[in-house]
Amino acid sequence: GAAFAMATVTDGQETSDGATLTYPVVKADAPEAQQRINTVIEDDVKAFMQEIDAARVAGKPPAAKMSYEITKSSDELLSLKTEQFISEESAAHPMSYAHGYIFRLSDGKALTLADVQQLPDRKEHASRYTLESLNKRLAEPKDGAAKDFKKLETAPKDIYMDANGHIHVLIQRYEAASYAA
């Protein structure tokens, strides 16, 4: 395939009363890929802003912030991790979410664990990236499984790749344990 240049990432920012959201804006060689990538990120930003607005409407103005880091960038893939934090005025616990993305720069697709299995350098280890293998590893106490750990029903969509090419799976607290408010 044609070689693509690495994507460039700049800060996008939304600020409003008590909230500062900094998110990645991606510029890629292929315009359709660029649009696809930015739409995925914008949808997550919008969903978080709706949560912030809902708290305001409920009369609990929150402090909220969002940040991101680029975890891996090559001429084929761009991987990002975002952190979202919201603390409502009277809530016992602040909530935090981490989202991970691996985007393919040729078409902008956000890769899933199933897609990762198909990457040329992963095929021989494809079984590592299955839901079954993930649940097995999560259930091992050394991986910090909560006592009330419940198996994941579906493969987590929040994944990212680090600089060494390792795949990290982010599991939201509410996906793997019962959450007591």
Annotated model-derived regions:
Residues 1-181:
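Compositionally biased intrinsically disordered regions enriched in Thr/Gly
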